[in-house]
């Protein structure tokens, strides 16, 4: 079974818990990486078929767009991105369309990275940790993001302790 959008703390929490109850939902995207729990670890499972909660994309303000543009100018081609959630991170992502060979090694996967991945701006060709793969610990976004994730072998979901390990992060070039 897969955790889907939350490889961040789910595995660690399940490992420490005395009781583990899972929701089985066909709307949860199948994800590769650490987002996995064996059925033998479950105390119980409940089937639900409800759409996932969606996080509306924060629309950048005019000031956010200016800040995002300035930040994007500082990001060199071949950099590895760690991106956050909100107006300024979305403005930065929107301003990166002319960049080349960016990598993604981030805790939070958001809607803003999908166009950059699909256009080839984010290709992970310069990364040293999981080269060629997008890396995240959790996904926060829309149905479009969840559809992008589903059975996507180019996206690896890892436990947050692994993803955010500073010794691992520093292996990548030009982390921003």
Labelled PLM ranges:
Residues 1-176:
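Conserved phosphate- and dinucleotide-binding cores of soluble alpha/beta proteins
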């Amino acid at each position: 079974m897969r955790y889907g959008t939350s490889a961040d703390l789910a595995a660690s929490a399940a490992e420490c818990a005395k009781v583990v109850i899972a929701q089985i939902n066909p709307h949860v995207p199948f994800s590769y990486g650490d987002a996995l729990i064996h059925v033998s670890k479950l105390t119980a499972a409940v089937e639900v078929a409800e759409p996932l909660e969606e996080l509306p994309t924060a629309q950048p303000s005019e000031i956010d767009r200016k800040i995002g543009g300035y930040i994007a100018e500082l990001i060199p081609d071949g950099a590895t991105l760690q991106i956050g959630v909100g107006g300024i991170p979305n403005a930065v992502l929107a301003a990166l369309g002319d960049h080349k060979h960016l990598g993604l090694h981030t805790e939070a996967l958001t809607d803003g990275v999908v166009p950059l991945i699909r256009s080839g701006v984010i290709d992970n060709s310069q990364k040293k940790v999981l080269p060629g793969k997008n890396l995240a610990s959790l996904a926060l976004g829309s149905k479009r993001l969840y559809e992008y994730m589903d059975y996507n072998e180019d996206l690896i979901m890892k436990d947050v302790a692994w993803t955010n390990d500073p010794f691992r992060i520093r292996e990548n070039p030009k982390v921003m």
